[in-house]
Amino acid sequence: RYLFKFYSDETIKKLNENIFQMDEQIARALILHQLLGTRISDTLTLKTDCLSIRENRYFIRIEQVKSITFEKAISDEIAQLIIKSIDYTEEHYGKTKYIFVKKEDPLRPFQYSMLQHRVMQMIRKNDIRDENGELLNFGTHTFRHCYGKKLTEMHIDDWMIARLLGHKTLQSVHHYRKIGNKIMADETRAVREKIDMILMDVVKEWD
């Protein structure tokens, strides 16, 4: 039976303190990945036109690889971090399809293997260890599990969690038909703000 793995809050804090010292665009990708709770492939293939504004709220369009496309509301702070990432890419590479692009080939997005390699290098260099004293084994999917765990701890309904995580299930589809983006923005605002606060204070250092 597969067991979900979670990082403790202390481990996440320690890991992020060092992530912020990495290449700034790689750091932005990893922070956004945590804040959005998306699959890493969804984060790395975010497009430069993924943001929209409706009723004074930011929404992000997430196009899951070989799957569904969906939108969810995000905080102004996350939107500004995305805009900053887009501006960085445009300044260095001109107009591109993706927000996070390879330096040697801006037509293509970041690759997960590159991201994991760079983070593991950083973990070994800084000797980052888990609660058992073992060298931290990094996997971006663990961030996603932590995001989902935070939602369940806040007693959010399963269908709302599925929506926020971009899961495609019959139960989720049933509820998607009943709920509009405006209601989604209102009902999840407190949840998203609590999750956002884990990282946004440190992100301000990039301003």
What are these regions, as identified by a protein language model?
Residues 31-35, 44-56, 165-170, 179-181:
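Amphipathic alpha-helical scaffolding segments
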Residues 54, 63-109, 118, 122, ...:
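Basic, alpha-helical nucleic-acid-contacting "clamp/cap" segments
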Residues 63-68, 165-193:
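Catalytic-site neighborhood detector that most strongly recognizes the C-terminal catalytic loop/helix
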Residues 24, 41-62, 78, 90-98, ...:
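Extended intrinsically disordered, low-complexity coil regions enriched in Ser, Thr, Gly, Ala
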Residues 7-40, 144:
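Basic, Lys/Arg- and aromatic-enriched nucleic-acid-binding interface segment
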Residues 32-33, 60, 79-86, 119, ...:
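Short, structured motif recognition centered on aromatic/hydrophobic residues
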Residues 43-44, 148, 155-167:
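Active-site-proximal segment of tyrosine recombinases
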Residues 26, 132-154, 172:
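Short basic/aromatic active-site micro-motif
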